[in-house]
Every structure is written in C-alpha cells, then in structure tokens.
C-alpha cells in the first residue's frame, strides 16, 4: 500500500523522538539514575519505565501521569521535567537480580516511543563507572499501549516502504518530462512541372 509522504515521514520520525543512555551501572545496595530525553511536543504525554529484554512482555514498573508530579513505587521513582524535556528514573537499594534490560518509553496513541537501557549491578565493593552518554543506536518503535512488537518492524517494513516511495517519486519525475516544441516542417517544392517543360522544349 502506498503511503503519502507526510504520513510516512511522521511514522519514521517517531523512533527518533526519545533517547537515553545505552547502559548504566551502579554498585549493589546503591542507587542509579537514568535520564531519558525527548523532543518537543511530548511534554504532557505519559512516560514509563519497564523491565524485560523483549518489550512485548516487559513489565511496566512505574509511569508518570502526564505531569511533572513525581511518582514512586517500591524502590523505583520517576519524575518528568517538561521544561528540559527530560524524565528521570531512579532505582534505589539495588540488588544483583536488578541487572537486566529496561526501557524508557513515552505512551501515545498508536506506536509508543522508547529506547533500551541496560542496567549493570556490580557486586558490593566493586568499582562502578558513570552512565554512558545518550545514544540513539538502540531506538525502537513500540506497537500498542505496552503491547509492542519487535523492532525489526522498522527495518523490514518501514525502510522498504521509504525506498519504494523514493523510487516512485523518481519514476514520476522521469515520466513527466516537458514535451519538446514541434519544429518547423520542411518546405517541399514541386520541381516536376518546370522540369517537364524544360524537357519538352
């Protein structure tokens, strides 16, 4: 099915609207903070934090209410700074089994937005390093409200559609060439009559 360029670009641009650190690490019994940044326009949307390698089965641990009011559940808290377009997730009293893959996400009508964050918990007494800088290398699109399909949807569906769209545009431009103006028709003179007269004389 052919999609209008505006709709296609809107769909593809969604996966670049949020980014966070590729990984964070902290010591056992300590705490860690994850900051996820989003683009303008998503300030009043619900932000969430879920756990699990696969997002179609990941468990939502906490989420905002679309405001800047902080929320806390057990050892996890979340707060959205809409002015800076950053929401912060804090995990306290870390245990070894807290090490896992997590997701920063924004709930919206249609595909949710999100980015993967790997949490590493070092054994007690081990040295820890700071969180890596934000990256968009692991961005993905989530399908549904917390019911998300695999990110390969982006690679195998949307990218080919974009390529088909570009090919169609190039083909249309090639087929809509400006027709050349008709040239002047050559003038033919009838020399048969004078030639006949000359031969008769």
Curated annotation (Swiss-Prot):
<keyword id="KW-0597">Phosphoprotein</keyword>
<keyword id="KW-0472">Membrane</keyword>
<dbReference type="GO" id="GO:0042802">
    <property type="term" value="F:identical protein binding"/>
</dbReference>
<dbReference type="Pfam" id="PF07686">
    <property type="entry name" value="V-set"/>
</dbReference>
<comment type="similarity">
    <text>Belongs to the CD300 family.</text>
</comment>
<keyword id="KW-0812">Transmembrane</keyword>
<dbReference type="InterPro" id="IPR050671">
    <property type="entry name" value="CD300_family_receptors"/>
</dbReference>
<feature type="topological domain" description="Extracellular">
    <location>
        <begin position="18"/>
        <end position="151"/>
    </location>
</feature>
<dbReference type="InterPro" id="IPR013783">
    <property type="entry name" value="Ig-like_fold"/>
</dbReference>
<feature type="signal peptide">
    <location>
        <begin position="1"/>
        <end position="17"/>
    </location>
</feature>
<dbReference type="GO" id="GO:0005886">
    <property type="term" value="C:plasma membrane"/>
</dbReference>
<feature type="site" description="Interaction with TYROBP">
    <location>
        <position position="158"/>
    </location>
</feature>
<dbReference type="InterPro" id="IPR007110">
    <property type="entry name" value="Ig-like_dom"/>
</dbReference>
<protein>
    <recommendedName>
        <fullName>CMRF35-like molecule 7</fullName>
    </recommendedName>
</protein>
<keyword id="KW-0675">Receptor</keyword>
<feature type="topological domain" description="Cytoplasmic">
    <location>
        <begin position="173"/>
        <end position="201"/>
    </location>
</feature>
<keyword id="KW-1003">Cell membrane</keyword>
<dbReference type="InterPro" id="IPR013106">
    <property type="entry name" value="Ig_V-set"/>
</dbReference>
<keyword id="KW-1015">Disulfide bond</keyword>
<dbReference type="GO" id="GO:0002757">
    <property type="term" value="P:immune response-activating signaling pathway"/>
</dbReference>
<dbReference type="GO" id="GO:0004888">
    <property type="term" value="F:transmembrane signaling receptor activity"/>
</dbReference>
<feature type="domain" description="Ig-like V-type">
    <location>
        <begin position="18"/>
        <end position="120"/>
    </location>
</feature>
<feature type="modified residue" description="Phosphotyrosine; by FYN">
    <location>
        <position position="188"/>
    </location>
</feature>
<comment type="function">
    <text>Acts as an activating immune receptor through its interaction with ITAM-bearing adapter TYROBP, and also independently by recruitment of GRB2.</text>
</comment>
<feature type="transmembrane region" description="Helical">
    <location>
        <begin position="152"/>
        <end position="172"/>
    </location>
</feature>
<comment type="subunit">
    <text>Interacts with TYROBP, which enhances cell surface expression and activation properties. Interacts with GRB2 in the presence of FYN.</text>
</comment>
<dbReference type="InterPro" id="IPR036179">
    <property type="entry name" value="Ig-like_dom_sf"/>
</dbReference>
<keyword id="KW-1133">Transmembrane helix</keyword>
<keyword id="KW-0732">Signal</keyword>
<feature type="disulfide bond">
    <location>
        <begin position="36"/>
        <end position="104"/>
    </location>
</feature>
<dbReference type="InterPro" id="IPR003599">
    <property type="entry name" value="Ig_sub"/>
</dbReference>
<keyword id="KW-0393">Immunoglobulin domain</keyword>
<keyword id="KW-0391">Immunity</keyword>
């Amino acid at each position: 099915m052919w999609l209008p360029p505006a709709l296609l670009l809107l769909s593809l641009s969604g996966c670049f609207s949020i980014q966070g650190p590729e990984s964070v690490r902290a010591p056992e019994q300590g705490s860690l903070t994850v900051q996820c940044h989003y683009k303008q326009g998503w300030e009043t949307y619900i932000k969430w934090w879920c756990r699990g390698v696969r997002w179609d089965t990941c468990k939502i641990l906490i989420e905002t209410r679309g405001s800047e009011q902080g929320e806390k559940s057990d050892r996890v808290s979340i707060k959205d700074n809409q002015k800076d377009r950053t929401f912060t997730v804090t995990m306290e009293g870390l245990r070894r089994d807290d090490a896992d893959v997590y997701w920063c996400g924004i709930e919206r009508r249609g595909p949710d937005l999100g980015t993967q964050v790997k949490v590493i918990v070092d054994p007690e007494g081990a040295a820890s390093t700071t969180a890596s800088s934000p990256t968009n290398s692991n961005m993905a699109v989530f399908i549904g409200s917390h019911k998300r399909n695999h990110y390969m949807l982006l690679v195998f569906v949307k990218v080919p559609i974009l390529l088909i769209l570009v090919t169609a545009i190039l083909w249309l431009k090639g087929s809509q060439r400006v027709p050349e103006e008709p040239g002047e028709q050559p003038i033919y003179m009838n020399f048969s009559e004078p030639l006949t007269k000359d031969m008769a004389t």
